[in-house]
Each structure stands twice: as C-alpha cells, then as structure tokens.
C-alpha cells in the first residue's frame, strides 16, 4: 500500500528546459559577481573551501569561478555548485525576475494528493534551499505547503539505491510503501532496487517513452489514479 510519494522536480513536475534554458544561464551570468560580493559570508567561505577540496588544490578566486562555470557547462551535480546556485536563484525569485513553471497535470495531482492527506516529499539534485525557492514562487503560487519534506544530494546520489533507503528511514516508512516519480530511468532503477514502487514520467519533451523498460511509464500525472 502506498503511504507516501517521493517526487523529482526537473522533467517530472517542471520542464527540463526551465533549468537548462533559464536557471543555469541565470546563475552562470551572476556567479562571479555574487561570489565577489559575498566573500565575507561564512557560508560562502565554506563553499569555496569545499570547491578547493574537491579540486584537490588551492585555487585563486578566478579559478574558483571558472571551476563553477565548468561544472555548470558539464551539468555536474556537485553540492557546492548547487548551494551557490541556490543563493543566486533566491535573489532572482525574491526579486520576481524568476518564476517557476509547473506542469498543469502535476499541479492538479499534487493538489489532489494534498487534499487526500497523502504525504509528499521532494528528492532533487538541486539543494533543499533551491527546491523550497522553486516551490514558493511557482505560476500557481506558493506550493511548499504541499510537501512534508525535501531531500537533496546531501542524502546521496540519486542513482544509488542506498539514497532511497535513507529517505525511507528518514520518513519512517518501509521502501515498499513509497511511490517514487521521476523522468530519469537510472533513478527509477535505483529506487526500485531499494524496494520502492516506481513510475517513470515519460513526457515527450523531457524524457521520451523507453521501449522494453521494466517499470511503469506515464506521460502525465493524470494517468496515476491508483492512490
């Protein structure tokens, strides 16, 4: 029996294009200015040190910026990058320059599950800070109240079954009582291996239907009617 739903963001409830065509360029254009402006912030100092540790050497400020830009270009899911992007996007969302698109079918279903008191959790490679920003500034208003919790890469890699076991433990449920929704086939496999129920969201514009994929696929949240 499904007692909770764990949900990915990018390509699942929101178009992949928003992240790649709006959010990534927005952060890339502002990274250098943001770091220089916030060098005295203890959190930014820690993030810069984390970047140096990952690169395994001391870096000049210019090299730190170039490293972050390289990671953006390579679509790296690295925690210090996600944290910096979270800060930059926060400024954008709070100023009204950014507004998060949510698929209409996803919004309808999230609203329905909320009304049915089905606990929902988010698991995304974007930082928890960025996730909350996203859902507090959507085209449908502030949706953060829909969710009982948020998880990011601090929990673990989304393609590692252990990450899903940790989330199940954190929410106090057995994996088999959780339904995981994602557009990413590797994440679906990992969650299934951990024992979760899974459905791949196969929107043509984001992550097309995969022939002979061993798990259920739908192209709209409207097709998920058994909760």
Curated annotation (Swiss-Prot):
Its cofactor is Mg(2+). InterPro entries: Enolase-ppase_E1, HAD-like_sf, HAD-SF_hydro_IA, HAD_sf. Keywords: Amino-acid biosynthesis, Hydrolase, Magnesium, Metal-binding, Methionine biosynthesis. It catalyses: 5-methylsulfanyl-2,3-dioxopentyl phosphate + H2O = 1,2-dihydroxy-5-(methylsulfanyl)pent-1-en-3-one + phosphate. Binds 1 Mg(2+) ion per subunit. One of its GO terms (biological process) is L-methionine salvage from methylthioadenosine. It is an enzyme of class 3 (hydrolase). Pathway: Amino-acid biosynthesis; L-methionine biosynthesis via salvage pathway; L-methionine from S-methyl-5-thio-alpha-D-ribose 1-phosphate: step 3/6; Amino-acid biosynthesis; L-methionine biosynthesis via salvage pathway; L-methionine from S-methyl-5-thio-alpha-D-ribose 1-phosphate: step 4/6. Its EC number is 3.1.3.77. GO terms for molecular function: 2,3-diketo-5-methylthiopentyl-1-phosphate enolase activity; 2-hydroxy-3-keto-5-methylthiopentenyl-1-phosphate phosphatase activity; acireductone synthase activity; magnesium ion binding. Bifunctional enzyme that catalyzes the enolization of 2,3-diketo-5-methylthiopentyl-1-phosphate (DK-MTP-1-P) into the intermediate 2-hydroxy-3-keto-5-methylthiopentenyl-1-phosphate (HK-MTPenyl-1-P), which is then dephosphorylated to form the acireductone 1,2-dihydroxy-3-keto-5-methylthiopentene (DHK-MTPene). Belongs to the HAD-like hydrolase superfamily. MasA/MtnC family. Monomer. This is Enolase-phosphatase E1. It comes from Persephonella marina (strain DSM 14350 / EX-H1). The lineage of its organism: Bacteria, Pseudomonadati, Aquificota, Aquificia, Aquificales. The gene is mtnC.
């Amino acid at each position: 029996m499904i007692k909770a739903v764990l949900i990915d963001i990018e390509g699942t409830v929101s178009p992949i294009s928003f992240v790649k065509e709006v959010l990534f360029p927005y952060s890339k254009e502002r990274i250098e200015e943001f770091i220089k402006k916030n060098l005295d912030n203890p959190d930014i100092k820690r993030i810069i040190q984390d970047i140096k540790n990952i690169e395994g050497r001391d870096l000049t400020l210019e090299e730190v910026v170039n490293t972050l830009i390289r990671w953006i270009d390579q679509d790296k899911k690295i925690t210090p990058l996600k944290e910096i992007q979270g800060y930059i996007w926060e400024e954008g969302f709070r100023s009204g320059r950014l507004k998060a698109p949510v698929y209409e079918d996803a919004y309808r279903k999230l609203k329905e599950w909320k009304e049915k008191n089905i606990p929902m959790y988010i698991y995304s490679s974007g930082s928890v800070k960025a996730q909350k920003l996203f859902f507090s500034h959507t085209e449908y208003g502030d949706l953060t109240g829909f969710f009982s919790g948020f998880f990011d890469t601090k929990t673990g890699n989304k393609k590692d079954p252990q990450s899903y076991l940790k989330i199940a433990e954190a929410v106090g449920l057995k994996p088999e009582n959780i339904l995981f929704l994602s557009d990413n086939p590797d994440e679906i496999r990992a969650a299934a291996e951990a024992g979760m129920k899974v459905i791949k969201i196969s929107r043509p514009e984001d992550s097309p239907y995969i022939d002979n994929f061993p798990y259920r696929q739908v192209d709209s949240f409207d097709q998920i009617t058994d909760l």
